[in-house]
Amino acid sequence: MELEVRHLRALCAIADAGSLHRAARRLGVAQPTLSTQLTRIEQALGGPLFTRERTGCRPTPLGRTVLGRARPLLTDMNTLVREARAAAAGGDSRLRVGSTASRALAGWLRRLRRPGLEPTLQMDVSANALLRRVTDGQLDVAFVHEVEGCALHIPEDLRLRVLVEREPQFVMLPADHPAAARPVVRLADLADDRWMVDPTVDGEWDGVHRMLRAVGLNPRVLHGDYHTAASLVATGEVVTVCQPSSQSRPDTAVRRLYGDPLGVRLLLAGTRAELDAVFPALEDAYWEAARQSTAYREWLEGGGIRTLPRCPVAATGGGRVSCGRAEGSRSRRPRDVAPPRPIG
């Protein structure tokens, strides 16, 4: 059997997912099919590439060597396809943007649009899914958020720009809720409320659960997407975490949580050239949206740090990167960050 590009993609998917089950789901194939394919690849290369354990799969020394060569090859192949498609389009370049939900999106796309460049948008609640699409050549850049304490699976061949190191998450509650009368809400004030979270958003459930558990709360939790949550907040059924750039409405109130107990890191992922080209527009669009939110603007003016900090990236294993909270002033020239490559 000769190795093909699809085989290399399968190996990288297994390494990034950490298990055959999760990798098969991401690739859209049955697990037995992927397992059979892996066995054939290992036979062709002369040895096992992963150790199978109850908790998942880990690359063997041979596997790390193969993955170290496979990832650059996939990057080059994706670049070849992207450049060929652009040339075939006669120079009418399309910038393929992926993003999780953000109020900065409209302003960002507006700033990117110009003669000869038409941005397209793919939305997904899963940041990990968007990052994989960039690696696979389906997207050029992806704007994602990483919930504090819930590291994303960031492929080694992506480069990152940190837009905001720690964006505090606020709470949306009914406008007539007693706690809405104050500009800052304590979690204890919401002890009797039901919460709604979206379990399909990478890290959201874990982050909210950890935040509530830290203050001794174990509230009733419903599952639903953001639009469902906003509707139920308006009718007084639930409260929910929200982006600080969210705006209050006549029937809902957006308030800061005391102590800012939950934060996310905002990242732009892509190739270096693409990041350099589109990051300034994203930066401007984000702070424009921030100023339009009364609650976020007051937080910033009251001492919240408008920061695009520098933070070294540390390997945590499994193709992940994590970064601690950073303090500092906002920089106009953020450094791009490359995830560490495995040794071997």
Curated annotation (Swiss-Prot):
- Gene3D superfamilies per the UniProt record, alphabetical: Periplasmic binding protein-like II, Winged helix-like DNA-binding domain superfamily/Winged helix DNA-binding domain
**Annotated keywords:** Activator, DNA-binding, Transcription, Transcription regulation
Gene Ontology cellular component annotations, sorted alphabetically: protein-DNA complex
Start and end residues of each HTH lysR-type domain: 1-60
Q: Where is this region: Disordered?
A: 322-344
In this chain, composition skew of type Basic and acidic residues spans 327-338
- The DNA-binding region ranges are 20-39
Q: Which InterPro entries match?
A: LysR_subst-bd, Tscrpt_reg_HTH_LysR, WH-like_DNA-bd_sf, WH_DNA-bd_sf
User: Record's SUPFAM superfamilies?
Assistant: Periplasmic binding protein-like II, Winged helix' DNA-binding domain
Family label: Belongs to the LysR transcriptional regulatory family.
| Primary role | Transcriptional activator of the gene (snpA) for the small neutral protease.
* PANTHER family in alphabetical order: SMALL NEUTRAL PROTEASE REGULATORY PROTEIN, TRANSCRIPTIONAL DUAL REGULATOR HCAR-RELATED
Record's protein name:
Small neutral protease regulatory protein
**Native organism:** Streptomyces lividans
The gene name on file is mprR
